Every structure is written in C-alpha cells, then in structure tokens.
Amino acid sequence: GSSKVVSLWDQSDQRGTRPEGFLYGTEWTREEINNILQSDMDTGSNRKDEKNDSDNISSNSKNNVRKLPNDENGHGTFLAAIAAGREDIDQIFSGVAPDAELVVVKLKQSKKYLREFYSIPDGVWSCQEDDVMLAVRYVINVANKLGKPISICLGIGTNLGGHNGANGLERYISYLSLLPKIS
C-alpha cells in the first residue's frame, strides 16, 4: 500500500534535507516514506522489536536506509488514527476522514533554558510556541503546494498560554482561520 502521509517534518532530526524555507529539521516525502516502509517489509524489519532507536538507521543496514521518525509516546499516532484512520471492519473502527491524506510534524523538545525557566521536570515533554507556529506554517505550505484544502489538528497535549486568544500562537491561529481552504 501507500502511506497516507504526504509529507512529514521532523523538527528534532537535523541530519536530513530541511523543508524549503525552514532552517532546521528533516523533511520526508511520501515517496521516501513508502520506500522505507517497503524496504522494511521486504527485509522483515519490525521497528517495535528494535532496541536502539538512537542512531535512526533502519534494520536494512546494508543499504544504510534512514529510519522514519518514531512517535515515542504514541500521542500523534493516536490522533492521526482518529482523524484519518482507514476503516477496519473487524475492529469496528474508522477515522473521521478515512480517505484523507496527512501532513505530519514531529515537534522538537523545547530548549533547556525554557524548560528550566518554567520548571518543567526532566522526562516531561514540552515544546516551544514558535516551533508550533512554524509547524502550522509548514502544513499550510504543503497544502498550498498540493492545491488542497486543509484541516489542522493541533493535539499537542500541553499549552502554557492563557487560552484567551491573546498570546502569539492563539492570534496566529485565529488569523489563519480567516483564510480560505484552512480550518
């Protein structure tokens, strides 16, 4: 089959090709994702059985194929399934939009000085507002390139904002919601 993911930006990986117009991270195209998934199927790789994910190299080491980003806590995968999961009659499941394609951003961990300033304990995941804003910009850029409308799911799981529409991220999202083809 083919991945539902049209494009993936891993903000935490600095080793690959950056998305156009962005200064960090690695972008994965659908073609690259499908090639890696097919390679793993051909070699019998099962990422769940792999012990060390730190080198980001696929089990198909003779071709030195890079591994796709991993969803460490499963939150993004869970939300993607709700949004666009394929119908599974045996499990009585279907995502809200099973025929939808996905543009995915794996946010990077917030910088150490910010984690210390906000007293965020080690082991607790957090991200920076500017990285979220750039993630939204990336998703919109991909949708525009494809000429497709887009619905954005921002299931981050954390937000230090006032939740009153006054901070930068909230104002940015409000502005974008006024644009055509974005919801």
Residues covered by each model-derived region:
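Extracytoplasmic/secreted envelope proteins and their assembly/folding machinery
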Residues: 80, 133-136, 170
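Catalytic cores of nucleotide-enabled group-transfer and carboxylate-activating enzymes in metabolic
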Residues: 41-52, 80-82, 89, 173-175
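Subtilisin-like serine protease catalytic core
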Residues: 1-40, 64-130, 147-151, 161, ...
